UniProtKB/Swiss-Prot annotation:
UniProt-recorded name of the protein: Chlorotoxin-like peptide Bm12-b
InterPro entries: Scorpion_toxin-like_sf, Scorpion_toxinS_Cl_inh
Annotated compartments: Secreted
Keywords tagged on the record: Chloride channel impairing toxin, Disulfide bond, Ion channel impairing toxin, Knottin, Secreted, Signal, Toxin, Voltage-gated chloride channel impairing toxin
Disulfide bond listed as a keyword: yes
A Pfam match: Toxin_5
Disulphide-bridged cysteine pairs: C25-C42, C28-C49, C39-C54, C43-C56
Domain comment as written in the entry: The presence of a 'disulfide through disulfide knot' structurally defines this protein as a knottin.
Function: Toxin with unknown function in healthy organisms. On glioma cells, interacts with chloride channels (probably ClC-3/CLCN3) and MMP2 at the surface of glioma cells. This complex is then internalized via caveolae, thus inhibiting the chloride channels necessary for cell shrinkage and tumor propagation.
Major site of localization recorded for this protein: secreted
Secretion signal, residue range per the UniProt entry: 1-24
């Protein structure tokens, strides 16, 4: 059982680490018509809304 808790802890830890490595752009709301533009500007011209998340391409 401790092994299972360890796996869950590692998965949660990696998820939090991945989330904190993003550039800190806010979520994409479908109610805002300018959300795609705001996401691009936040990411320095390389952002794209993917579902509720603004993802920055690191090129």
């Amino acid at each position: 059982m401790k092994f299972l808790y360890g796996i869950v802890f590692i998965a949660l830890f990696l998820t939090v680490m991945f989330a904190t490595q993003t550039d800190g752009c806010g979520p994409c709301f479908t109610t805002d018509a300018n959300m795609a533009r705001k996401c691009r500007e936040c990411c320095g011209g390389n952002g794209k809304c993917f579902g509720p998340q603004c993802l920055c391409n690191r090129e």
